[in-house]
């Protein structure tokens, strides 16, 4: 058989990977390549969502040379306008992306304005990303409301001053201040309503020139009626001359009400004082009756005590009269072994033995005498 040589097949050339020197170098180089690939992958990932960039979702470069997804930048701009790495303002190099970011911010501002205008209570946001435009709009609306309240308060103050001047200028009182008719109250309400409407139609603060009285013609435009009070004829413009005849009647009505209230209060005070006096008299009468009853009871008690004393005295006299017979009865009773003595209403029985030969002691009566 022929000899086959395998030297060519098993010859390890310098470029063969099975060479130990070359194998070690190739493994180290592959490790470096993998590490560099990992670094590139981390560098090519978005810092907000930590996901790599793809062809469908490419990276968007900012002015600070940081790359993010466009959607991540839009979502981040809802919270802050600064870069999350270097804290600089978001400025995109791509003009189309920058326009899209600006449009999103404008839309967000419009939504916040609509929400703040629709809700009656202002919403306090917890974030610090308030824009100057939003703050200016809020301050302007607050200023408008404040000025509106001020103008309304000034208008009301002018109305009150004008009404007080009309009431204080008149010093005419009604003919009978103690009586108030329902028609007077109706006229008062009518006057107040008409004056309020006229003041609303006129300027809130009248000028001094408009307050000057105009000449009045011979025919009076306000006829007086005994039953209905005063009637007001409608005029084209409210003036001081047309309102001056109203003021005496308008002022006389409050004065009449005050006088009526004063008279009623005086009557109430008198009735209260009279009722107090009646109560005091009743209490005194009851006390006198009780005293008389107590005196009668004392008299009866004294009479009873006197009767009892007389009865006791009679008993004493009767015991004195029958003193001898009582002694005889006691001597006879000793023979049988018992001794009876009478002392008022009390009877004492004492037994004594005859064998000892004791002598009977004389018993004392209530009056202090011995029998």
From Swiss-Prot:
GO MF terms held by the record: ubiquitin-protein transferase activity; zinc ion binding
Q: Does the keyword Cytoplasm apply?
A: no
Enzymatic class: transferase
A Pfam cross-reference name: zf-RING_2
| Gene Ontology biological process terms, A to Z | megagametogenesis; microgametogenesis; proteasomal protein catabolic process; protein ubiquitination; regulation of cell cycle
Q: In which pathway does it act?
A: Protein modification; protein ubiquitination
Bias (Polar residues): 200-225
Q: Where are the transmembrane segments?
A: none
The record's EC number reads 2.3.2.27
| Alphabetically ordered keywords of this record | Metal-binding, Transferase, Ubl conjugation pathway, Zinc, Zinc-finger
InterPro entries found in the cross-reference section: Znf_RING, Znf_RING/FYVE/PHD
Q: Where is the composition biased (Low complexity)?
A: 226-252
- Zinc finger residue ranges, RING-type: 46-87
Residue ranges the record marks as coiled coil:
none
- List every stretch annotated Disordered: 199-254, 348-371
Give me the reactions it catalyses. Answer: S-ubiquitinyl-[E2 ubiquitin-conjugating enzyme]-L-cysteine + [acceptor protein]-L-lysine = [E2 ubiquitin-conjugating enzyme]-L-cysteine + N(6)-ubiquitinyl-[acceptor protein]-L-lysine
In which tissues is this gene expressed? Expressed in stems, flowers, green siliques, cauline leaves, seeds and roots.
Protein function = E3 ubiquitin-protein ligase involved in the positive regulation of the gametogenesis progression. Mediates the proteasomal degradation of KRP6, a cyclin-dependent kinase inhibitor which accumulates during meiosis and blocks the progression of subsequent mitoses during gametophyte development. Functions in association with RHF2A. Possesses E3 ubiquitin-protein ligase activity when associated with the E2 enzyme UBC8 in vitro.
The UniProt subunit note reads as follows:
Interacts with KRP6.
**Protein name, UniProt field:** E3 ubiquitin-protein ligase RHF1A
Species in which this protein is naturally found: Arabidopsis thaliana (Mouse-ear cress)
Gene behind this protein: RHF1A
């Amino acid at each position: 058989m022929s000899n086959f040589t395998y030297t060519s097949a098993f010859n390890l050339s310098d470029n063969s990977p099975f060479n130990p020197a070359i194998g070690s170098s190739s493994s180290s180089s592959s490790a470096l390549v993998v590490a560099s690939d990992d670094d590139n992958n981390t560098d090519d990932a978005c810092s907000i969502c930590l996901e790599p960039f793809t062809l469908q979702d490419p990276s968007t470069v900012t002015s600070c040379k940081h790359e993010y997804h466009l959607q991540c930048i839009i979502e981040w701009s809802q919270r802050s306008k600064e870069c999350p790495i270097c804290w600089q303002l978001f400025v995109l190099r791509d003009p189309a992306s920058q326009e899209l970011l600006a449009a999103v911010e404008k839309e967000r501002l419009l939504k916040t304005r609509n929400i703040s205008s629709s809700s009656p209570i202002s919403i306090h946001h917890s974030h610090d990303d308030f824009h100057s435009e939003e703050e200016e709009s809020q301050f302007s609306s607050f200023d408008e409301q404040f000025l509106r309240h001020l103008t309304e308060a000034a208008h009301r103050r002018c109305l009150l001053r004008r009404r007080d001047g009309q009431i204080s200028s008149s010093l005419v009182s009604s003919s009978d201040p103690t009586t108030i008719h329902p028609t007077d109250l109706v006229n008062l309400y009518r006057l107040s309503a008409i004056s309020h409407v006229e003041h609303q139609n006129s300027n809130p603060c009248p000028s001094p020139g408009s307050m000057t009285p105009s000449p009045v013609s011979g025919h009076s435009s306000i006829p007086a009626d005994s039953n209905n009070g005063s009637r007001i004829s409608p005029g084209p413009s409210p003036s001081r001359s047309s309102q001056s005849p109203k003021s005496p009647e308008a002022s006389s009505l409050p004065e009449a009400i005050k006088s009526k209230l004063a008279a009623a209060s005086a009557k109430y005070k008198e009735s209260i004082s009279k009722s107090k006096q009646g109560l005091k008299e009743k209490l005194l009468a009851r006390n006198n009756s009780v005293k008389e009853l107590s005196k009668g009871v004392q008299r009866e008690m004294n009479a009873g005590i006197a009767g009892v004393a007389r009865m006791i005295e009679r008993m004493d006299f009767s015991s004195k009269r029958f003193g001898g017979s009582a002694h005889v009865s006691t001597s006879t009773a000793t023979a049988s072994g018992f001794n009876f003595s009478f002392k008022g209403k009390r009877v004492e029985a004492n037994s004594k033995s005859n064998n000892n030969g004791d002598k009977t002691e004389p018993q004392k009566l209530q009056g202090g005498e011995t029998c």
